A protein has these predicted regions:
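PLP-dependent amino-acid enzyme catalytic core
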Residues: 1-272
Length: 272
């Protein structure tokens, strides 16, 4: 499977997810006076995160044989909820197993159990959990729903960029948070195809600048020894799919913990 996405891939993903995930709002922000800054409110997704786009995109694209074998994912956060919600959207007919660390908060595990999925708490660390999930995939032939290393997932994440470009065709810059990079790969493909002059700017915490360092080295750092950060959801290594789309990324901005704190306060006080 090619690691490069096309606009057609993103549009096809939108058709798959559209029945369950309508577009999220694009709203002006009051947090940056004098700047036409708009927020793509992915917090309005049913699971509170854009991750559900990619999970549903992949899971709804499976053929009959793949569906019988089921899917599995390892996650301690938003991706797990996205996979669980996608399973519900598909009527519970797709056997879905979600692996979470034994140390995962019980409130989060309880939320996952509300969906038609088999939740398995395995391993003391996230790496242990991933190892268990990989063993399960090998034993069962289930399809892996990776958080970012699958073009069907990245295409699903890219539907957010498609919505922005269609709603705001004069957009000059998109600021995209980057962890593994599935979001920026999909968003960049869609936005650049529809708005050729748009600048795609990756944003990472200085506790985990894996993309910046990968670009400097000329190879993706698949794992990265991130320091503790408020933006823990984007900590860690960069994926191969994201790195394959590095030509579409115009700049990488690295922010400090103090800047992240200031941004959170500004958003809460000005944009609620």
């Amino acid at each position: 499977m090619s690691q490069r996405l096309t606009l057609e891939d993103v549009r096809a993903a939108r058709e798959r997810i559209r029945p369950s995930l309508p577009p999220t709002p694009l709203r002006p922000s009051l947090a940056a006076p004098g700047v036409d800054l708009r927020l793509k409110l992915e917090c309005w997704q049913p699971t509170g995160s854009f991750k559900v786009r990619g999970a549903l995109s992949l899971m709804s694209a499976l053929g009959e044989v793949e569906r019988r074998r089921g899917v599995a994912a390892a996650s301690a956060g938003n991706h797990a909820l996205g996979v669980a919600f996608a399973a519900q959207c598909l009527g519970g007919a797709l056997p879905t197993t979600v692996f979470v660390p034994a140390s995962a908060p019980q409130a989060k595990v309880a939320k996952l159990r509300r969906f038609p999925v088999d939740v398995r708490q395995v391993g003391e660390t996230y790496d242990d959990t991933v190892e268990s999930a990989e063993a399960f995939l090998g034993e069962t032939g289930a399809t892996s729903v990776h958080a970012f290393e699958d073009t069907r997932v990245a295409a699903g994440q890219g539907t957010a960029g498609l919505e922005v470009a269609e709603e705001c065709p004069d957009v000059g810059m998109l600021l995209v948070p980057v962890g593994g990079g599935g979001l920026i790969a999909g968003v960049a493909v869609a936005a650049k195809a529809l708005v050729p002059g748009v600048r795609i700017v990756a944003v990472q915490p200085d506790a985990s600048p894996a993309l910046r360092e990968s670009l400097a080295l000329g190879r993706p750092l698949l794992t990265y020894p991130a320091r503790p950060t408020l933006a823990d959801g984007v900590a860690g290594g960069i994926g191969e799919i994201a790195f394959a789309h590095r030509d579409l990324i115009d700049d990488v901005v690295v922010v400090t913990e103090a800047e992240i704190e200031d941004a959170i306060v500004a958003l809460l006080s000005e944009d609620q």
